C-alpha cells in the first residue's frame, strides 16, 4: 500500500468515525425520548389510581403552576401527523408503549449500523497498519 492509498484509507476511517458518532448521537436522542415516554406512562398510571386532582403543571423553563384536573380518566394524545385525540388513560398508555417499541426497534437498527461501521473501521485500521509496515520497510 503506497502513501496515497494510506491517506485515502485514513480519510475513509475519519468519515466512518464521523458517521458512527452521528449514529450514536441519534441513538442517544431516541433514548431520551423513550425515557420521556416512560415518565409519561408513570404519570398516567398515577393519575389512573388517584382521585387527587391537584397537580403541578409545567409551563416551561422549569417553572410550574398549581392546577386542578377536571377529568383524570381521559387525556389528549398525539396519534401522529399533528392529530390529537381524546383517549382513556389505558389507551394512551398503550399508544405510548407502541411508540416506545417502535423507537427501540429504530435504536437497535442504528446500533447495528454503528457496529457494522465499527467493523469496517477495524478492517481499515488493519489495512493501514499493514500498509505502514510496508511503507516503513521501503524507507529503510
Located regions from the model:
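Intrinsically disordered, low-complexity regulatory regions in eukaryotic proteins
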Residues: 1-79, 83-140
Amino acid at each position: 500500500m503506497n502513501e496515497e492509498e494510506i491517506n485515502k484509507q485514513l480519510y475513509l476511517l475519519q468519515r466512518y468515525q464521523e458517521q458512527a458518532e452521528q449514529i450514536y448521537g441519534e441513538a442517544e436522542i431516541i433514548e431520551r425520548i423513550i425515557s420521556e415516554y416512560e415518565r409519561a406512562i408513570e404519570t398516567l398510571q398515577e393519575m389512573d389510581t388517584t382521585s387527587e386532582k391537584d397537580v403541578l403543571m409545567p409551563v416551561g423553563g422549569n417553572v410550574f403552576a398549581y392546577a386542578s384536573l377536571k377529568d383524570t380518566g381521559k387525556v389528549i394524545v398525539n396519534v401522529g401527523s399533528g392529530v390529537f385525540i381524546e383517549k382513556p388513560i389505558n389507551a394512551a398508555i398503550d399508544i405510548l408503549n407502541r411508540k416506545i417499541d417502535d423507537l427501540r426497534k429504530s435504536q437497535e437498527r442504528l446500533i447495528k449500523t454503528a457496529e457494522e461501521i465499527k467493523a469496517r473501521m477495524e478492517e481499515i485500521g488493519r489495512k493501514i497498519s499493514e500498509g505502514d509496515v510496508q511503507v516503513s520497510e521501503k524507507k529503510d
